[in-house]
Amino acid sequence: MRSQHINAMNNSHSLFAKTLRPAAAALTVFSLIAVSIVQLKAAGAARTVVVWSEATAPTNVYPKDINGAIAEGLKARLKGWEVVTACLTNENQGISDALLQKTDVLIWWGHKRHGNVSNELVAKIEKRVKEEGMGFISLHSSHFAKPYKKLMGTPCSWREYKADGTSVKITVKDPNHPITRGVKDFSLPKIERYGEPFAVPEPEAVVLDGLYTKPNGETEPGRMGLCWTVGKGKVFYFTPGHETYDDFFRPEVRLIMANAVEWAAPKK
C-alpha cells in the first residue's frame, strides 16, 4: 500500500514537471523578447542636438533666426536625432535643466548679448561638457560667448574683425576627419574677416583652413575649423557665420554642421 502511494506521488510530480516545463520555457522566451524590445528601443532612441541663438540676426536674411536655419539643415541630414531650437529670450534662457541633461550636442550662436547669458547656465554647460561629455559647437562671433570662453579658459579674441567685403576660399585641411567627411573646398563671396592670431589653446586639429581675399586684392590666411577635447567633451569652433550673410543656408556649411554634431556627440 505504501509502495502504491509513493508511486502515485512520483507520477504526480512527473506530470507536474512536464506541465511546468513548457510554461517555464514560454516565460523565458517572453522575458528574452521583452529585454530585446527594450534594447531595440534604447538603440533607436533619438539623440538630441540643441541649436541656441540670441534672436539678433536680421529677419530679411534669417526669417526663422540663425538657429532655425541651422536646425533646418540638421533635420534634413541627421537621422535618429531630435533637433531642438532654443533662444535667449525663451524661459530659462532657452535651456532648462531637463533639456540640458538630455542634450548630446549644444550648438551656440551669439553676437550682441553675450553678457545677458547667466553665469549659472554657463556653469551648468561647462559641467555637462567637462564631466559628462556633452559636445559644444561655437559659431563665428560666439568666440566671445561665455560658455565657449569658459571652456577654452582664454580671452578667445582675434587680432581684428572686418566686414569690408572680404571673400574667403575654404579648404579641407584634414580630409580624413569626421567633420570634413564629404566636404569639398568651397568659397564664400563675403565673410567677416577675423585676423590671426586667435587667442585660444592650441587645437588638437585644424580641419578647415581659409584664405581671405581683401577688397584691395591682398590675401591673408585664417583658420576656419578648430577642434579640442575639453574634459570628457568635444568642442568645435567654426569661423564663418556672420548674421548678414546666408552661410547657414549653404549646402557645404550645412554638411559641416551635421558632421560636426555627429563628431561632437558622446559615445553611447
What do these predicted regions represent?
Residues 55-58, 90-92, 111-115, 142-147, ...:
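Solvent-exposed loop/turn segments at secondary-structure junctions
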Residues 39-102, 261:
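Aromatic-Pro/Gly-enriched surface loop or interdomain linker
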Residues 51-52, 99-146, 232:
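Short alpha-beta junction capping motif
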Residues 43-46, 51, 87, 215-222, ...:
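Extracellular ligand-binding/catalytic regions of CAZymes and related secreted enzymes
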Residues 131, 136-174, 179:
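Hydrophobic, well-structured mid-protein blocks that either form specific transmembrane helices
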